[in-house]
Amino acid sequence: MRYTVMYKKRHRFRRYLLLCVSLFFVFSCSQKGDNKKVVVLAFDGMDPRIVRMMFEEGKLPHFKKLAEMGDFKDLWSSIPPQSPVAWSNFITGKNPGGHAIFDFIHRDPETYLPHLSMSETIPPETTIEPGSYVFPISKGQVILKREGAAFWEYLNEASIPSIIFKIPSNYPPVEAGDGSVSGMGTPDLFGSYGTYQYFTTDRMDIPEDYSGARLTPVDVIDGAVREVIEGPENTFRREPVLNTKGNVKRDGEGNIKYKNPTLTIPFTTWIDPENPVIRIDLPDQKIILKQGEWSDWVVLSFKPLPFIPAISGICRFYAKEIHPYFKLYLTPINVNPKDPILPIDWPGGFARKVAENAGYFYTQGMPEDTKALTNNTFTTKEFYVQSQMVLKERNRLFDYLFSQFKEGFFFFYYSSTDLGSHIFWHLRDKNHPAYDPQAREELGDVIDQIYQQMDRTVAKVLERLDDDTTFIIMSDHGFSPLYKNFHLNSWLERNGYLALNYGKQTGSLLRGDIDWSRTRAYALGFNALYINLRGREGNGIVSPGAERDRLVKELAEKLAAIKDPENEAAVIKRVHRREDIYDGPYLDRAPDLLIGYDWGYRTSWESALGDITEGDLLEVSREKWSGDHCGATEIVPGILFSNKKIRMDRPHLYDLPPSIMAEFGIAKPDDMIGINIFAPPRVPVERELSGEGISRLKALDYI
């Protein structure tokens, strides 16, 4: 079943008036040349402190050259500095009150249940269900939940061509002049952010607790492993849900509960008894791999019904081990860019054009398989190899797309700087609990290596730079270490703000363990804290107005006073009230408080999903996910380079859209809050930080 795309309604009339004004400016500026270009390279998570350290070591010559040509400044991120929030600031020129993305995780205030913030897939409203079959009468929809227009939509209306490749928080992608492929937020064929499959004869390979994977114990029989590749659900079929005794489950009204079965493809892996070689037999192809070898992209076709078109996906196999154990890894099954079942591109067919010219590529939003590492399916070196494959693939795509770019706006996104910093921080930080001297000796400082690889991409743009081109390099945030996790919901419970059902010592919001009749505040997401507000939450008990405001003030003061008992360091640097930092039509959707953690601290994974745990409130982080950026905004600034002078001391992400539009002579709309970074302000712009200010940032040691 293919899905249609639904976008939020735009204020078309207001934009039409703006377009008329903008076209006047475009016409007036046409004497400067008809070949105006703006190139933006986005290196997610690139940190200005690391950049400056590498400048001193002479390791980033092309970044340095660009800074000397124009400028280099810290770039102020969003509050909170999470990627979906930050990129939405950049896309819309607004803060979260204007675009309604506040965290990776949002919640339904009526049910309290969490959901992903960036997009939503809605199944067909109308179906006919004869027996075990399901036939949709209407189409399903994929909704982009970010509000507000993307700035390149104004470029489109002024007939400025644009290429937007892999920008986060843009699935499904909004219209872009020449073409767009969606980035972070794009699911795999399961509808997840990335679920890999792993087949192993070693039962010890399968941990008790894991996520983001389908791990299958297998046996070798007659020299072969016979298994199936699991695909998406077959939405054209249904089968009864059975309980543990094999009986059909029914709902409260006595109706049978149904589920969609999983589509599968059988395969047989033949194992050479003497050599470390396997042959994978699929229904329409055979693949030979040596131990430690990766396959090329493999096209899979899942057939829901004989008369229904197949669902196409792509994947890669990795022969992790052949002897003495059999261990076979399969990437998440990605949407096939040559035949996408989901709306990953605009216009339809653009992803196919890219793949036909540059080869198949990961279409899932976050291709580096961090789950395979944290589940211990990958070693650190194996993750390094896989992440380098992603980077080389992205470079190949850049080379093709940049070769096609002649005029207008070009945006290209790299994820390697972000995922690499999340995972490999522990290799550069001897103070980190997960520091691994053996991996450091083997792999070196991987973050430095990735930055140097990005420097080579910068060189490619500098080679083509001309007087008609504005070149910008940016990141959405920087990085800090993750030394300890803070169990925020546990703190709320122990301090009387959150109550568990009677008899419970620990619990989970997802399992219904919270007593909402006695709960005044709860946390969901990485930086969000909500008041259990009467009239907003399904079982709210705190009255709006004075009672709510007193509670918000009390919580902010107590949270800011929390210290690490081990060293008396502040755990939380700053607590923001939403009304102090946001404005716009979606302020009422925001969390009541935004928690800005101090250097080295972050919300625990458990608390982010609403869990209440026992034990210490602070837990040492020994995971390889060792770098993070979900702290206070001022400790993780991004980078901003340009071949033009930046005439602002403290540029923000939301300043970039009006700056880019101004390069094409397009006036910004009234609801964009940013300022043109290349134009001297007519009135001095005051953007003082609360607390110590920007000087505190520059005084921070990197490690």
Each predicted region: which residue ranges?
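Bacterial N-terminal signal peptides
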Residues: 18-26
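C-terminal motif of bacterial Sec signal peptides marking the signal peptidase cleavage site
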Residues: 27-28, 702
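Active-site-proximal N-terminal segment of extracellular/periplasmic enzymes that hydrolyze or transfer
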Residues: 30-72, 81, 202
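A long, amphipathic alpha-helix that forms part
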Residues: 32-33, 51, 384-410, 426-473, ...
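Long, internal low-complexity/basic segments
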Residues: 34, 610, 650-657, 661-667, ...
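Beta-strand elements within well-structured catalytic alpha/beta cores of enzymes
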Residues: 35-52, 66, 90, 154-155, ...
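Secreted, luminal/periplasmic, and some membrane-associated catalytic domains
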Residues: 43, 57-58, 70-74, 81-85, ...
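Low-complexity, glycine/alanine/valine/leucine- and proline-rich hydrophobic stretches
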Residues: 601-656
